[in-house]
C-alpha cells in the first residue's frame, strides 16, 4: 500500500502508453451484419461474412492519421468471437466465411505489427450467448480461458479493454483476471476494471474535465450507472484516463445509411483539445463495414483529423524546458502566437495544481490563460498576440515543478 504522503508516479509502461496519445477503436463483429449495437447472442453466426476484409487498410489508415495503437473488439456482449477459440462454437470457426479458417484477431494483430503500431484487445466480460454465464464460477473459468488464448496467441498487447456495460452489479474474479494479464502480458495496460493501470474518463463523448489528474482511487463503471467501481486494494495510485468516442455519433458499430452522423473535423478537433489537450489519451472509434473495410468517408475524415493536428502542432515557434516555478520563452523577433502546450516530466509525478501564461509586450505582462492540472499535456488556446517573450508561472504545486516542454505556436485558428 502507498503511504499517504508518497507521491504517485507512473510505471515506465504507463509513461509509454501516455506518450501514444491517440488510439483507434475498431468495433467489428456479428453486430456489423445485423444492424445492431448490442446483439443478444442469438444471431446466426453465418451472417458474419465480410466480403473483402483488409486489416492492413485499418492499420495503414490509423498510422497515416498519426494514431499509435488500435484496439479490436475480439468479443462484444453478443459473445461472438473473432478468433477460433476453443471455448465456444459461437465464433469465426463456425461460419462459411473462409471455410471456418478465418481469424480476424490474428490478421489485425499482424497488420498492426507490419505498420508499426501497437495492438490491443477488447474482451467483453458480459456474454449474452454463453449458457454458463449464469453460473459465476463456471463463467469466471470460461472467461479466463478466452483471455489466456488471446494473451498467449496474439501479443504483444498494449492494452486490455474491459467494458463495464451489462455487468453492473456482477462480480467477476478480477484478481485472477488481472493476475493473468500481468502474467502473460506484463507491459499491457488494464482498462478500468479490477486492478486498472488506466481508467475510463466517465463518458462516451471523448471529453475530459478541465482538471483531469492522473491519480485516482475510483472510476465510473459504465454509462448505465452512476455507481463507482471498487478497485482491488493493490491498484496503483497513478491511473491516467482514456477518453473514448465513436466517429459516428452514438454508434460504435457500422450501420446502413449512417454517414450523416459522421463527426465534423471541427467536432473532432474540439474533442482533441478536450482529451489529449487535457492530458488524457483519445480512443476514437472507426468501424469497418460489411466489406470488412473502413468506409471511405470515415477513413477520409480520420486522415483529415490527423492532418489538422499536424498542421497546428507539428512546428512550434520555440520550445524550452526545465525545473522551477517559472519558465520564460524568449524569441529573437516578435512573432504571432495563439497556442501554448505544456508538458510535465511525469516520471517524477504530477506536481502542478495551478498556473498562468503571460506575454511580454511593451514592458508589461499580459495574461493569456490560466489553468489547473498539466500532467502529460495541456493545450492552451488564446487570442492571437504578437510577442517576443512568453512566461509560464506555476501558482500552486507540490514539490518543484519539472517541465518536460513548454512550446508556443501560431495556428491561425480562431476558436
Language model segments and positions:
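Extracellular Ig-like/FN3 beta-sandwich strand-entry sites
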Residues: 387-389
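Mature catalytic domains of secreted/periplasmic carbohydrate-active enzymes
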Residues: 1-384, 393-415
Amino acid at each position: 500500500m502507498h503511504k499517504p504522503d508518497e507521491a504517485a508516479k507512473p510505471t515506465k509502461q504507463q509513461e509509454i502508453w501516455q506518450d501514444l496519445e491517440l488510439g483507434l477503436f475498431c468495433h467489428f463483429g456479428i453486430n456489423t451484419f445485423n444492424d445492431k449495437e448490442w446483439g443478444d447472442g442469438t444471431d446466426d453466426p453465418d451472417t458474419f461474412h465480410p466480403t473483402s476484409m483488409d486489416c492492413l487498410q485499418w492499420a495503414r489508415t490509423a498510422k497515416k492519421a498519426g494514431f499509435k495503437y488500435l484496439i479490436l473488439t475480439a468479443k462484444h456482449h453478443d459473445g461472438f468471437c473473432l478468433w477460433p477459440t476453443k471455448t465456444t462454437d459461437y465464433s469465426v470457426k463456425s461460419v462459411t466465411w473462409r471455410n471456418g479458417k478465418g481469424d480476424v484477431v490474428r490478421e489485425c494483430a499482424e497488420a498492426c505489427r507490419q505498420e508499426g503500431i501497437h495492438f490491443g484487445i477488447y474482451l467483453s466480460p458480459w456474454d449474452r450467448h454463453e449458457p454458463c454465464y449464469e453460473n459465476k464460477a463456471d463463467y469466471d473459468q470460461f472467461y479466463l480461458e478466452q483471455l489466456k488464448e488471446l494473451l498467449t496467441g496474439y501479443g504483444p498487447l498494449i492494452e486490455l479493454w474491459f467494458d463495464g456495460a451489462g455487468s453492473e452489479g456482477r462480480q467477476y474474479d478480477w484478481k485472477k483476471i488481472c493476475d493473468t494479464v500481468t502474467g502473460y502480458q506484463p507491459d499491457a495496460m488494464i482498462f478500468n476494471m479490477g486492478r486498472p493501470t488506466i481508467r475510463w474518463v466517465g463518458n462516451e463523448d471523448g471529453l475530459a474535465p478541465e482538471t483531469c489528474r492522473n491519480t485516482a482511487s475510483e472510476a465510473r463503471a459504465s454509462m448505465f450507472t452512476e455507481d463507482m467501481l471498487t478497485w482491488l486494494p493493490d491498484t496503483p495510485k497513478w491511473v491516467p484516463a482514456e477518453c473514448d468516442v465513436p466517429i459516428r455519433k452514438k454508434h460504435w458499430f457500422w450501420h446502413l445509411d449512417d454517414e450523416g452522423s459522421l463527426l465534423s473535423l471541427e467536432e473532432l478537433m474540439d474533442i482533441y483539445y478536450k482529451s489529449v489537450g487535457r492530458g488524457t489519451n483519445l480512443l476514437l472509434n472507426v468501424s469497418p463495414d460489411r466489406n470488412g473495410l473502413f468506409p471511405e468517408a470515415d477513413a477520409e475524415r480520420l486522415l483529415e483529423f490527423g492532418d489538422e493536428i499536424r498542421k497546428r502542432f507539428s512546428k512550434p515557434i520555440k520550445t524550452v524546458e526545465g525545473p522551477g516555478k517559472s519558465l520564460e520563452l524568449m524569441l529573437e523577433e516578435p512573432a504571432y502566437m495563439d497556442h501554448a502546450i505544456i508538458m510535465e516530466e511525469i516520471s517524477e509525478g504530477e506536481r502542478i495544481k495551478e498556473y498562468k501564461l503571460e506575454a511580454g509586450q511593451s514592458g508589461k505582462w499580459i495574461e493569456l490563460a490560466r489553468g489547473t492540472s498539466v500532467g502529460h499535456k495541456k493545450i492552451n488556446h488564446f487570442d492571437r498576440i504578437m510577442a517576443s517573450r512568453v512566461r509560464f508561472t506555476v501558482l500552486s504545486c507540490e514539490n518543484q515543478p519539472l517541465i518536460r516542454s513548454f512550446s508556443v505556436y501560431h495556428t491561425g485558428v480562431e476558436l
